[in-house]
Amino acid sequence: MELRLFLFNRFDDPLGELAWGGRLTHAEEIGGEDTLEFECPDAPAKGDRLLWRDPDSGAWREHVVVRTDEPLRGACRVYAESSLSEMLLDFIEMAQLVSRTAEQALAAALAPTRWEAGTVEDGFGKHGCMLYHTNALAALRRIEEVWGCEAEPIVEVSGNRVSRRSVSLAARRGGWRG
């Protein structure tokens, strides 16, 4: 499957397909970074969104351009992070999670965001923690830690654009790749 990058501006308006060349590197760490690095002839703007279908899993992925290195001559180097990074701007004043399920905790963490709760596997039990003066992404990472689960962003596409963004919780995502 040929990897195609579809470019959208920060307001989710389509800008077309982004031409890229050379090597594209996708690095993902569970509960950590999820980045995309590549070179292209024309630099996308900071905040633009890249939508692509993962050739390994067939799942749609979305990344946000956070930096471009533009030399005087040659290709532009693009660095993008998972669209979950937008949750860094969503603030949680306070959420007391006392004897809550993972599903209830996820709903609290996603409340100030445009993301929805996806599928939550059974078996995480009831736990508690305090989410106080934090961002939604830090809250999501705390939920992973306390409930012993792994979060997975799910991007659904219809009509050549993102139709839904959700976060699912699983006991374990994918396999070990080193």
PLM regions and their residue ranges:
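Short, solvent-exposed secondary-structure boundary motifs
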Residues: 11-18, 53-60, 139-146
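Short beta-strand-centered interaction patches in the first periplasmic/extracellular domains
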Residues: 72-87, 119-178
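Short amphipathic beta-strand and strand-loop transition segments with alternating hydrophobic
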Residues: 22-28, 65-70, 153-155
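Short amphipathic beta-strand/extended segments with alternating polar/hydrophobic composition
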Residues: 16-21, 62-66, 91, 175-178
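N-terminal start-of-chain detector that recognizes signal peptides
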Residues: 7-13, 22, 35-41, 50-54, ...
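Juxtamembrane "anchor/assembly" segments of surface/extracellular structural proteins
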Residues: 1-46, 81-85
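Surface-exposed cap/loop segments at beta↔alpha junctions
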Residues: 41-123, 128-129
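Generic structural motif
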Residues: 3-5, 20-24, 115-122, 149-153
